[in-house]
Amino acid sequence: MKRLLDAHVSIYARPLVTWYYTPMMLPFSRHLDASAVVYDAMDELSKFKFAPEHLLDLEQELLDSADVVFTGGASLYEAKKDRHTNAHCFPSSVDRKHFSKARRELPQPADQADLKHPRLGFYGVIDERFDIDMLRQMADMRPDWSFVMVGPVVKIAEEDLPRAANIHYVGGKTYEQLPVYLSGWDVALMPFALNESTQFISPTKTPEYLAGGKPVVSSAIKDVVRTYGHLQGVHIAHDAEGFVHCCEKALEQSRDPNGDWLAEADLILSASSWDTTQARMAGLISQVLGEDISQEAPALLVAAE
């Protein structure tokens, strides 16, 4: 991997910016002579199930060498800001043009087309962050609702997944397909468990679901509550009964797609574009480099997950 990386970097002009999403990339990239080192912390990876034991040591090394730190949400910023003098908070952004396609009536994919309404959906990785017991209880309480689960199942045994006639696992889908599935839902769900692995998350699903014109029902994830909890179209639930109650209110909103709840959400989304985020990040990196990279970027190495 190191030889491949060196060969790749050798073809680019300087300056070189190394951009890390995870400290696990350090062992084969720490030798690079970078003009700027960016640590883009999107999750508290050490809290995830099966996290490598040496992850925390590598993260400290990355924090020591980084010139600037970006954090994906307020909770993560609070966890990192005292560990680096140049840390900045970037709440979830959204590609409104892409996800707003879901506001139109789109031809439905075969694995969703025949599912009865109301449809309540989730997309994303189904792992230890997902509250499978919550899903099981909701499906039992409302057998007339269809629960559509889009995404790969990871770190959860097949036999532990809740199974019911109204729970539908349709597997992982591409980014391009997500608005199509979203368009066929009545309510979008974020039934996250409240545990170590969700303590610092700031789900990008929240603005994506809203951009798709769907009311959202979520567990009480800290960054969701404080960033979106005041919106009429975002409902916060604390248990299965609360989830069902919130979903009933959200279903009423879904029947009024031009209601005040969506106009209110759109106002928030208007300031949440990835272009705005990119421009702000580029400005902070420019300060490190001492040159403007907003128009012509330097050689960028993305040391990704």
Task: Label the predicted regions.
Residues 4-7, 52-69:
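Membrane-proximal helix-turn-helix segments that form the acceptor-binding/catalytic region
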Residues 130, 176-181, 188-210, 217-229:
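Nucleotide-sugar-dependent
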Residues 156-182:
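Nucleotide-activated donor-binding/catalytic signature segment of Leloir-type glycosyltransferases, i.e.
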Residues 233-241, 249-255:
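Conserved acidic donor-binding segment of nucleotide-sugar-dependent glycosyltransferases
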Residues 274-305:
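C-terminal alpha-helical cap of glycosyltransferases
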